[in-house]
């Protein structure tokens, strides 16, 4: 049996699939992986990305933060790829119960998926750090470099988890609950190097753990199937 045939059989035999995805899921949509060859971590910048994407940097240098954010992070022209669409199809068929993503791009929603846990937040929503008023992407794009609240003039922040910030406890708890209930877990496009997100996999005691990634994650996993190919190419060949 080929790896694809094995994957198809596992999906056919599962009724509670959870998908856990990282940056590699969106690279086929043209969004570079932070840690990949062409990623932000390998580009020459005045500050390193980890510093620029920290809460303290956002507060101290909102202009430089937003310059970096708008030019390097916002992926406005990206469209869902085959992986996003196939996952939405699997959810519609009642096979896939949840998507847990480390991405902030909103491409799973754009493809039609409903039950999504965004561990690192979303670039599609924003809030005033002073009064809490909520804003959408259009407000940010139509504002000058740094967006300020139209009510209280407070600094507006993206609803993404920056370095020095904790992940949302409720999102984490719900994601862990979904993984604990799963009979199949597909881990794709992530090196599982970021905690506490990577620790969520410890909650999985189901039958099939599948990894689709360029490299096998360093984390010790009881993997049933490992596929070293682009996520979209693999999932595109799956029949629902």
Name every feature range the model reports, one short phrase each.
Residues 1-240:
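Conserved catalytic core of sirtuin-type NAD+-dependent deacylases
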